[in-house]
A protein has these predicted regions:
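Catalytic active-site module of serine/aspartate enzymes centered on a nucleophile-bearing elbow/loop
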Residues: 265-298
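Short beta-strand/loop motif that positions the catalytic acidic residue
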Residues: 235, 241-243
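Active-site loop/oxyanion-hole signature of alpha/beta-hydrolase fold enzymes
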Residues: 61-104, 108, 287
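Conserved hydrolase catalytic core segment
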Residues: 99-143
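Alpha/beta-hydrolase
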Residues: 148, 158-230, 237
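Conserved HGGG/HGGXW glycine-rich cap/lid loop of the alpha/beta-hydrolase fold
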Residues: 15-78, 92
Length: 298
């Protein structure tokens, strides 16, 4: 790497301008570079910190436009399409003077990374699709409902279960950042394989997680429905697909479909995780990601 790239990858927070919108990113760790796109859309990036990964990789955490200290579009909370996020990712790669890079996307961030890899194969060295799926829409929602029903059966006797169920019911009426954060914190136990069995460990995340309300509409108020199934056969970059056995949102069914559809793919099922394997099984997760991005860094 040249001196410009080294400076722009120095530890800490950085800000660039992407077509008039501030785009922040945060650099942590040491080793080969991997950009990390968080989920939501709208969840503040800090939940995705991966200290075990940072021991072997330089992780560039993207703070997506519309969230945290990054700028907001004039059309906020609308207009945050995968194409918009992809343009910001490519602008960041240009700023870092990286001809190619590995991209990790968690949940909705996985949707963005898939899109970026399909649109810009020359800029993507490989992708980590972490709790992603090949599609959204009615089929995805139906699968999530079935998974949530299974979660409620497993936890039927837990006195805190009604709070989680109420949070799921409130998702359809979110209209501002405060409501988004409240619902997110209410949902969080369902995103772990065994939240209540490890509540002391996970409670600080639940208390601190924040975000910004971002709709699923483009700037013309048209819903962005994703279906990458036909396109994924053309995804040229190697892929690592990671899923938690107990993920209720982007579960094993979708991970297996991604693994089948992408020509050069490998699948890791984290048997003791839900949606947050980097927190629930950090060492297994980190070894898989680092071995994929930089096997020589062992």
């Amino acid at each position: 790497m040249d001196n410009v790239t080294i400076d722009r990858l120095s530890p800490g927070v950085h800000t660039i301008d992407v077509n008039g919108t501030a785009q922040r990113y945060h650099v942590h760790g040491t080793g080969p570079v991997c950009l990390a796109m968080p989920g939501g859309p709208g969840v503040d990036w800090e939940y995705l910190r991966m200290p075990a990964v940072e021991r072997r990789l330089t992780v560039v955490y993207v703070e997506p436009i519309g969230t945290g200290g990054s700028g907001r579009l004039a059309s906020h909370p609308n207009g945050y399409t995968r194409e918009r996020y992809t343009r910001a990712l490519i602008a960041l790669l240009d700023h870092l003077a990286l001809p190619k890079a590995y991209l990790l996307g968690h949940s909705h961030g996985g949707f963005v990374v898939q899109h970026c890899a399909l649109r810009h194969p020359d800029r993507v060295a490989g992708v980590v699709l972490y709790e992603s799926a090949p599609l959204t829409g009615p089929e995805h929602v139906a699968e999530a409902i079935a998974n949530v029903q299974e979660f409620t059966r497993r936890n039927a006797d837990n006195p805190e279960l009604p709070e989680v169920v109420n949070a799921f019911q409130a998702t359809a009426t979110i209209s501002n950042d405060e409501e988004f954060g409240t619902v997110l914190r209410g949902l969080l136990p369902s995103y772990f394989a065994d939240y209540w069995g490890r509540a002391e460990e996970f409670a600080p995340l639940r208390a601190s997680v924040r975000g910004s309300h971002i709709s699923s509409l483009d700037e013309h108020l048209v819903p962005e429905i994703i279906d990458d199934r036909a396109a994924l056969a053309a995804l040229a970059a190697p892929a690592l697909v990671i899923v938690g056995r107990y993920d209720v949102i982007c579960g094993v069914r979708w991970a297996r479909e991604l693994d089948t559809l992408i020509p050069s793919s490998q699948l890791l099922v984290l048997e003791n995780s839900g949606h947050f394997g980097h927190i629930e099984e950090p060492d297994v997760f980190a070894d898989a990601v680092a071995d994929f991005v930089a096997p020589q860094s062992k």
